[in-house]
Amino acid sequence: MELAALLSQIAVRIIKEQEAVIGPLAWDEARKVSGLLIIDQKKGEINLQESGAKETIDRLVAQYERLFGKASHEVCKDAVQDIIAEMEPDQIPSSLK
């Protein structure tokens, strides 16, 4: 799978996992992250700016951690561990390593 598609999948998985914990507020917080555009919340469709997509995911993780603490960061990492296991180390956003 192409890196841009993988990173988008990671972002959606993080948002949906946070939504399972905190409800629709997860989408509201994701909207505040620069470089991430919510296309269709119900379908789970987003768009990441291709340049800096890894950094956008780092900002998304930081947004949740800032509000909900370290446990929120771990929820993000756990949500995508199967995806990042298949990626090259230099492709993985630093917040998920």
Which role fits each region the language model picked out?
Residues 1-97:
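Long, compositionally biased intrinsically disordered regulatory segments in eukaryotic proteins
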